[in-house]
Each structure stands twice: as C-alpha cells, then as structure tokens.
Amino acid sequence: MSTTAASRVERAVAASSPADVEPVTLTASALESTAPSYLRDLKSELAAEGYQPATLRAEARFGEDCSIETQREADRLRDIVRAASFLGAGRVTVDVTAVADESRVEPALSALEERAQREGVSLSVEGPVAV
C-alpha cells in the first residue's frame, strides 16, 4: 500500500466511529440472483438485521479446455464482482477448483482483477492458479 493510500485510510478511520453491525462473508451460490433489484432488497434486509457484507466468496471451475467455457465462467465471476460492489462488500474471494489450461485462465483472472479494482473491490484467488 502506498503512503498516500495509507494516509487516506488513516484519515478516514480516524474521523469514524464504531458501527453496530456484524461483518459477514456471503457465498455467491447462496444468492438467488445478481440482478440489481434482488441485490438492493438483500442489502436492505441484511442492514435491517445488523449485517454488513464484507466478503463475497465464489467457487470457480475452469475444467474445460475451451475458450468459450472459460469466458462463460469469467463472465459469471464478473457478475459476482459487480454484486459485491453493489452490496458494499470490499472483497471477493474466488476458490478455483479446476483449471484445464492455465494459459486461458490467467488472462481471464487478470481481467477480472482489473474489473474488481474499477468496482472498488479487492480480489483474491485461491487454488491452482494465481493472479
């Protein structure tokens, strides 16, 4: 983290007060949809119960050596990153369980990381491939 980013964080936190909310990790597979209307309602319901999504966790499989299937899975993960941003979660954790061809998967995950940064979300990838 750069000095500038650290000082921004320190200033923001110093001017803050504790909130009575419980941070939670949501599992992407438990979401009924990534549609904005569903996410808006879920966010409201979570807040009413005193929960704040901190992390959205997703499982990913890149088990087929096929560009179309790799792109389809990358698109699904992009929807999850957008959902995390919409919900106010600061992190998306992707558990990669299968990789058929790293040369196809690594660029897709790099693009996903760039998207996450643009959405204001931190991305971490766990499993046999890294970003």
Segments from the language model and where they lie:
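N-terminal pre-domain/capping segments
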Residues: M1-Q71, D75
